[in-house]
């Protein structure tokens, strides 16, 4: 995928109005104390012109991202050094924690001093593209004759690519095997109906245990993306049509709302959902108080470390009865883009192509505990956790999707949907149709 994880209220908000961050599992908010040796040069570097060329004709590209602090020490530098050996182009790493990186990139975007190559969160792309801060990568790929068919995804604005996901962090469904066994359930549920019944049995057999958890805190509304829409996407559904909101006249969306409300009505959802954040949900699952949750694969290591005796596995998100097509799996990613103010765009594009090459991309995916952004990459997960391998197999059976990526004010869209969903669950909105109609009207304002 890690989709959180991904805030200082600050310079970024003032200089890049309208930008919001969708907090998903791979956002990397946790390693804020670690920095690479180049991290402290960030502020100074942003005040200089990007894409510098030395007197001897050597090209140096600045690469600003948060990946370096989340990868094992030295890995990103080693990978970038490989590009230098191959091309002669030097890469200056500007690595900081996720929140700091977002602030610095936003400041650089407003001032026209953005680093040549930047790590991107999908929720930033629309605003940066509309600002003219990041460049049209479709044109660069075309000029290079680059085969974009090898890319697992491309984040587009107005039909043009502005971000390429380098590695993907998947959101499979976690299931507590012990709780299922206690309720006499021998097989994981495959459909919505089976899932509802499983949740009821688990709750009935275990006092103080919930069947399912969904974090619906409006302070961090990514539960709409990762825990609600994952039901829709798994059954082949969509919330958009031609890049615009399509919440009404959408039978599967309506059915998804009714299904989730039905889980609340049945009393099988973990209490405190309206104030729950993703970290709270993970804690509930880790402590054995929830049977099912959809969550980032990025939390696998943490859960196993904090609850070594917990028996759990991954499963596909159940689908609506009768659906036999391929399922969509929610993903988050480390994206990459090129600054419009970069003076060496051709070299910058070559660097992106290098990171997306099958061999390099596979290596990066392994170190990041993620899945590759190049469909031809073959990561060697032979030494990986067995559960990680199982998740990768599930991922390969699905198609990656996250329709919030690249949308204008994506986090605010989640919050608005969240608020309307809560009103419907509580009975303050009369019907599913009314709830979706109200949300559709609110959402359309962001697409004017």
Can you annotate each of these PLM segments?
Residues 57-68, 89-94, 116-117, 162, ...:
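Short, well-ordered beta-strand elements
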Residues 1-62, 85, 139, 143, ...:
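Short, low-complexity disordered leader/linker segments with a strong preference
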Residues 48, 52-57, 121-172, 181, ...:
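Hinge/lid segment of periplasmic solute-binding proteins
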Residues 135-149, 211-222, 235-255, 305-306, ...:
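Short, solvent-exposed loop/beta-turn-alpha elements that line the ligand-binding surface or hinge
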Residues 90, 181, 265, 379, ...:
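Conserved C-terminal helix/tail region of periplasmic/extracytoplasmic solute-binding proteins
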Residues 78, 82-149, 156, 178-190, ...:
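Extracytoplasmic "Venus flytrap"/periplasmic binding protein-like
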Residues 198-201, 244-273:
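Glycine-centered hinge/linker elements that transmit conformational signals in sensory
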Residues 59, 81-82, 86, 90, ...:
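Extracytoplasmic/periplasmic substrate-recognition and gating elements
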